[in-house]
Curated annotation (Swiss-Prot):
Keywords: Methylation, Ribonucleoprotein, Ribosomal protein, RNA-binding, rRNA-binding, tRNA-binding
InterPro entries: NA-bd_OB-fold (IPR012340), Ribosomal_uS12 (IPR006032), Ribosomal_uS12_bac (IPR005679)
This protein's encoding gene: rpsL
UniProt keyword rRNA-binding, yes or no: yes
Protein name, entry field: Small ribosomal subunit protein uS12
Organism for this UniProt entry: Borrelia duttonii (strain Ly)
Function recorded in the entry: With S4 and S5 plays an important role in translational accuracy. Interacts with and stabilizes bases of the 16S rRNA that are involved in tRNA selection in the A site and with the mRNA backbone. Located at the interface of the 30S and 50S subunits, it traverses the body of the 30S subunit contacting proteins on the other side and probably holding the rRNA structure together. The combined cluster of proteins S8, S12 and S17 appears to hold together the shoulder and platform of the 30S subunit.
Residues annotated with 3-methylthioaspartic acid modification: 89
Residue span of region Disordered: 1-25
GO annotation (BP), single: translation
NCBIfam families documented for this protein: rpsL_bact
Subunit structure: Part of the 30S ribosomal subunit. Contacts proteins S8 and S17. May interact with IF1 in the 30S initiation complex.
GO-annotated cellular components: small ribosomal subunit
């Protein structure tokens, strides 16, 4: 326990709050280029082949981002927009690719929750 004089000389440091998505650097989204598109398996007890991409961001960071929705058109050198948001069963995946922005197409035949998957409103 420090004395009052010690606290006057050297006050207590407040703890810095850690951000969940440091590569965004307090921006809502960042642009990046896919360096590798692959599938990874989730941790127990889930089982699947989740689609992810390794993305080199415009600020120099390289992150792994999840590709949401059924089917995608991404390949190496595709320009994508990423947002924060982790995938709970994929360790190390802390970002999502935004569907319908830049080179990423929206999800085909999507009727509900379209805004989250970059799908236009169906005709009639």
């Amino acid at each position: 326990m420090p004395t009052i004089n010690q606290l006057i000389r050297k006050p207590r440091k407040s703890q810095k709050e850690k951000t969940a998505s440091p590569a965004l650097q307090n921006c809502p989204q960042k642009r990046g280029i896919c360096t590798r598109v692959m599938t990874v398996t989730p941790k127990k007890p889930n089982s699947a082949l989740r689609k992810v991409a390794r993305v080199r961001l415009s600020n120099g960071f390289e992150v792994t981002a999840y590709i949401p929705g059924i089917g995608h058109n991404l390949q190496e050198h595709s320009v994508v927009l990423i947002r924060g948001g982790r995938v709970k069963d994929l360790p190390g995946v802390r970002y999502h690719i935004i569907r319908g922005a830049k080179d990423t197409l929206g999800v085909n035949n999507r009727k509900q929750g379209r805004s989250k998957y970059g799908t236009k409103r169906p005709k009639a």
